[in-house]
A protein has these predicted regions:
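Glycine- and small/polar-enriched repetitive beta-structure motifs of secreted/surface proteins
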Residues: 1-320, 326-333
Length: 336
């Protein structure tokens, strides 16, 4: 009966190894459990399950071929997964690496190179094949995601968050400075406090904000709102986008404002409001579609050959106020 029970049990549990005593599973910690060839559980309450699995700290859990959990209360789950920080979690298998041309990365012997899932700092979490969380409190979720800043979060395949408390969400998104946020595929926030939202959006100045498909805010405190909008000057604001084949708004001088598709403000402290409006000179204002302000300290509501009237103008009362036609007619009548 004992032989029959033993035979039945082995039908549902098998572990292959050398079977010569050289790769026995070893559990040396109190209440530790080791299962699999060369599995090792050393800490109190440690659990190592899988060939070559190592659980080397109190309450550590390693599950999978060559999985390693060396931090207290750490969890490594997956082939080659590594959880080395206290309270760290690494869940995922290995991921084959490819170069920028899509060719497999090979070692010196011509063998493919694989990246393991790794959580190497206290309270770090790595989820996904080849994901890496390498600083305290960092979270990397997605195949190849990498969170290397303290308390940073990288969510998405190959997303990267390298600044302290940086956040990157989306395929190959990147947040590379402290407090930076990038949300959207290929989005990038590369300076302190920068925020990029949208596919391919880029925020590269301190406190810059880019919102929209391909929007770019590339200088200090600049703001670009709309698809492909560009704000490239300090404190600049570009509002209004354009899709492929059309002209986006662009605020390129310091402290300018460009609003509407194709609005352009290269002048310092200039404002362009309207489709294709241009404020070229410093402190100039262009109002209306195709308006051009090309002299300093002026306001333009049209352009040469495309002039506009200004209507509903109240009578001027101060020396620098505009004078309307009624006032001029009154002067003409009085002089007769």
């Amino acid at each position: 009966a004992l032989a029959e029970a033993s035979e039945n049990a082995t039908r549902y549990f098998k572990a292959n190894g050398a079977n010569d005593g050289t790769d026995d599973a070893t559990a040396t910690g109190d209440y530790a459990t080791a299962s699999g060839s060369a599995a090792l559980a050393e800490g109190v309450g440690a659990t190592a399950t899988g060939s070559g699995a190592f659980a080397l700290a109190n309450s550590a859990t390693a599950t999978g071929f060559s999985a390693t959990a060396t931090g207290e209360n750490s969890v490594a789950n997956g082939a080659g997964a590594q959880a080395t920080g206290a309270g760290s979690i690494a869940v995922g298998g290995q991921r084959q690496l490819f170069d920028e041309n899509g060719d497999p990365v090979l070692d010196e012997d011509g063998n493919p190179v694989y990246a393991s899932t790794e959580a190497t700092a206290d309270d770090a979490t790595a989820l996904g094949a080849g994901a890496v969380a390498s600083e305290v409190g960092a979270t990397a979720a997605g195949a190849g995601a990498n969170a290397s800043g303290a308390y940073a979060s990288a969510l998405g395949t190959e997303a990267t968050a390298s600044g302290t408390q940086a956040t990157a969400v989306g395929f190959r998104s990147g947040a590379s400075d402290d407090a930076a946020t990038a949300v959207g595929g290929y989005s990038s926030a590369s300076d302190f406090g920068a925020s990029a939202f949208g596919y391919g959006a880029e925020a590269s100045g301190n406190s810059a904000t880019a919102l929209g498909f391909g929007a770019v805010a590339s200088n200090f405190d600049s703001t670009a709102l709309g698809s492909n909008a560009v704000a490239s000057g300090d404190n600049s604001v570009a509002v209004g986008g354009a899709f492929f084949g059309f002209i986006p708004s662009e605020a390129s001088g310091d402290c300018p404002v460009a609003a509407a598709g194709g609005a352009y403000t290269p002048g310092f402290n200039s404002v362009a409001l309207g489709n294709l409006a241009t404020a070229e000179a410093d402190n100039s204002v262009a109002i209306g579609g195709d308006s051009v302000a090309d002299r300093e300290d002026t306001v333009s509501v049209g352009s040469a050959g495309s002039e506009r009237q200004i209507t509903n103008v109240a009578a001027g009362t101060e020396g620098t106020d505009a004078v309307n036609l009624d006032q001029l007619n009154a002067v003409a009548e009085a002089s007769e």
